[in-house]
Amino acid sequence: MEKTNNNIPSAEELAIYIKEATVSVNTKYEQSPVVLMVDDSIIGTLGNFSASIGKAKSKKTFNVSAIAASALANSTVLHYRSSFPENKRTILYIDTEQGEPHCQKVLQRILCLAGLPKNADSDNLIMLGLRKYSPEMIFDLEQDALCI
């Protein structure tokens, strides 16, 4: 049973969700395909999404730029190695802290690291600069963008 609306689930529905979500040591689970590695360590599998959090000025943006460039090029960039299926190559990059000029610089950096021209948008990279919106609007925009 997949929850598809924002209604508060009943106690019965919650019990079903808990049963579906229970992980057992006795069950064999299918491993998702590995699509992103740093050197020999797995950091991403198909079907997952990630957020980068950390202290201010801790190089989060540069790190995520390198990961995004690797995914965009579907190759190795600064020790990050990507191997995405052809039909799973769209990258959604959401920045909620930086203004549009800074986001544009990050976008150009990603394109450059991926070996692409930094003066042409890529069909496989969607960058959203959401700083100007309220937290509630950001949440709604993120939810909608994930359906792209």
What does each model-found stretch correspond to?
Residues M1-T4, L146:
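TOPRIM fold recognition
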Residues N6-I110:
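The Walker A/P-loop phosphate-binding site
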Residues P85-I148:
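Conserved inter-motif catalytic segment of the P-loop NTP-binding fold
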